[in-house]
């Protein structure tokens, strides 16, 4: 098996396991363990907290240990977590289910950060856009399918079968990772500072690098806006738009279609368009999408909302693949884990703030005001790119040296 093929198979298995676990947790907690909304909220929060708690230390270890070994650790953790979750459901221990959720999500965090850091050593620089697109396509497809599969299992068998499928996905991913070449640690023992110092070095590199700083700020504003949109979507759809729950879900599902088509189109865009076009298009088309949501209450609510969700899937997926490639090229290999962890921590840290802001503004000033906030944040994400050197990036940068 070729190294990239092994990594692609591992990506499909890992994201399938992660998305099945995400979809299965609330079903298991509610239908099997009888958890109420308060306890369910704690379980979902625990699962989501892994990105904030684990990313920065994991990024440092990714730069210290052979990356294949880190992938094995991550997948073994995910596999164990799925098995423990089944045991928790069978015995009725909610705390054990929460611990399994944290462990499984932590394994996903380590896997994602490691795979992004490992990819530049497996493919030529010119193949990075296509390779990143294929990895993102695998993630998008399983993310779209997992909730439906989990729901069918819960309806016809038992919610815990979702964890069995998650364990199978993690096991298949582990088999693929074992086919990767051994590799060596990016940094040697004599070069290793303390954990805190190593994390600060990664943060400082992101702040000092003009391209990485622009990417990070754009992602922060965009994620703030998107999670504000998610927070107000149900009251917007069921209220001013007049949608029933089925049409509400159908409109939102176009987001997944946008992700998949964006991942499919990304290699062609990388060949035909200079990077700055894609980097501006992604956040700019999100402003257009926000305008569609603003106009939706005046008529054709379903069509406008569906088009809006499609655009915030399609354009930002193109942007994500392009910026990931730029990030991989400008970051030296010994810093790759910490740089990726810094960016991801900032993104996941701002998401709950966006959701909170969207909900508060909608409650205090109304849904139109919340939509204006969302439009403004998407516009800021575009402005950050336009004012940064990313807007002048006509070719991909040369790979950084260690």
Identify the role of each PLM range:
Residues 1-49, 204, 208-255:
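Helix-loop boundary and gating motifs at the non-cytosolic
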Residues 5, 52-64, 68-84, 95, ...:
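C-terminal transmembrane bundle of multi-pass solute transporters/carriers
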Residues 18, 22, 48-55, 108, ...:
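Residue-level signal for conserved functional micro-sites within the alpha-helical transmembrane segments
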Residues 23, 139-151, 231, 263, ...:
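Glycine/proline-centered helix-kink
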Residues 37-38, 125-135, 245-246, 333-342:
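Loop-to-transmembrane helix entry/capping segments in MFS-fold secondary transporters
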Residues 100-141, 147:
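Cytoplasmic helix-loop-helix junction between adjacent transmembrane helices
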Residues 117, 121, 163, 169-193, ...:
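Helix-loop junctions on the cytosolic side of multi-pass membrane transporters
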Residues 138-176:
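Helix-loop-helix hairpin linking two adjacent transmembrane segments in secondary transporters
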């Amino acid at each position: 098996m070729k190294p990239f093929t092994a990594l692609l198979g591992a990506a499909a298995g890992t994201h399938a396991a992660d998305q099945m676990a995400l979809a299965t947790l609330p079903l298991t907690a509610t239908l099997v363990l009888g958890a109420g909304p308060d306890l369910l909220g704690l379980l979902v929060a625990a699962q989501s907290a892994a990105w904030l708690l684990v990313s920065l230390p994991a990024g440092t270890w990714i730069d210290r240990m052979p990356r294949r070994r880190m992938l094995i650790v991550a997948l073994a953790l995910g596999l164990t977590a799925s098995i423990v979750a089944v045991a928790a459901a069978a015995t009725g221990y909610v705390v054990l289910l929460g611990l399994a959720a944290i462990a499984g999500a932590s394994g996903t965090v380590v896997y994602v950060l490691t795979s992004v850091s490992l990819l530049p050593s497996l493919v030529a620089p010119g193949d990075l856009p296509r390779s990143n697109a294929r990895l993102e396509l695998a993630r998008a497809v399983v993310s779209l399918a997992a909730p439906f599969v989990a729901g069918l299992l819960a309806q016809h068998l038992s919610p815990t079968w979702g964890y069995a499928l998650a364990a199978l996905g993690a096991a298949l991913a582990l088999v693929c990772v074992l086919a990767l070449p051994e590799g060596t640690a990016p940094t040697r023992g004599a070069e290793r500072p303390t954990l805190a110092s190593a994390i600060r070095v990664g943060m400082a590199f992101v702040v000092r690098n003009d391209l990485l700083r622009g990417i990070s700020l754009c992602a922060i504003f965009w994620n703030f806006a998107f999670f504000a949109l998610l927070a107000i979507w149900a009251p917007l759809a069921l209220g001013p738009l007049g949608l029933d729950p089925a049409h509400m879900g159908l409109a939102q599902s176009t987001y997944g279609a946008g992700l998949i088509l964006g991942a499919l189109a990304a290699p062609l865009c990388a060949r035909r368009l200079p990077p700055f076009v894609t980097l501006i298009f992604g956040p700019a088309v999100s402003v257009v999408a926000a305008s569609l949501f603003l106009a939706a209450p005046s008529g054709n609510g379903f069509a406008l909302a569906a088009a809006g969700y499609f655009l915030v899937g399609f354009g930002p997926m193109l942007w994500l693949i392009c910026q990931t490639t730029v990030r991989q090229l400008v970051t030296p290999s010994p810093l790759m884990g910490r740089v990726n962890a810094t960016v991801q921590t900032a993104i996941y840290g701002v998401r709950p703030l966006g959701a909170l802001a969207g909900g508060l503004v909608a409650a205090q000033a109304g849904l139109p005001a919340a939509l204006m906030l969302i439009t403004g944040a998407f516009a800021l994400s575009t402005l950050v790119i336009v004012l940064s050197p990313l807007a002048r990036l006509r070719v991909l940068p040369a790979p950084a040296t260690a």
